[in-house]
Design a protein with these regions (language model features):
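Hydrophobic alpha-helical transmembrane segments
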Residues: 2-75, 83, 87-89, 95, ...
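Active-site-proximal acidic segments at structured loop/helix or strand boundaries
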Residues: 80
Length: 126
């Protein structure tokens, strides 16, 4: 592997490429749309319920982890589809594993959300 010199221009381009990836994720991936819709609801609810700094940290980390995992999953699926457009059992397992990782993070994020939001919602009725 070639050692390249540090270049500000290259660093700027890397952010540009990453930004394009984020735009592609939220504009073309249906599952990411769902995650974004939930994100908006959670942020609004958090603002209305007055989350603490640490609660916001947990929420933001969960949101970021799920969206990042969805991005990696989408990239793996796109690469698998390009490499093997026809059905392949190994490709199926690879895609299932990537999707499973997103599911695990999403479920854990729901649990974190329940731990944070349920007590706050219940306190509104007491």
């Amino acid at each position: 592997m070639e050692n390249k010199r540090f270049s500000i221009k290259d660093r700027i381009y890397s952010f540009k490429y990453a930004g394009r990836g984020v735009v592609r994720l939220v504009s073309r991936e249906h599952n990411a749309w769902r995650h974004c819709a939930v994100t908006v609801c959670v942020i609004v609810a958090g603002g209305l319920l007055g989350l603490s700094t640490f609660e916001w940290i947990a929420v933001v980390l969960c949101i970021g982890a799920v969206l990042a995992a969805e991005g990696v999953n989408s990239a793996i699926e796109a690469l698998c589809d390009k490499v093997s457009p026809e059905y392949d059992e190994a490709i199926k397992h690879t895609k299932d594993l990537a999707a499973g990782a997103v599911l695990i993070l999403a479920v854990m994020s729901v649990i974190v959300g329940l731990l944070i939001f349920v007590p706050k919602i219940l306190s509104l009725f007491h």
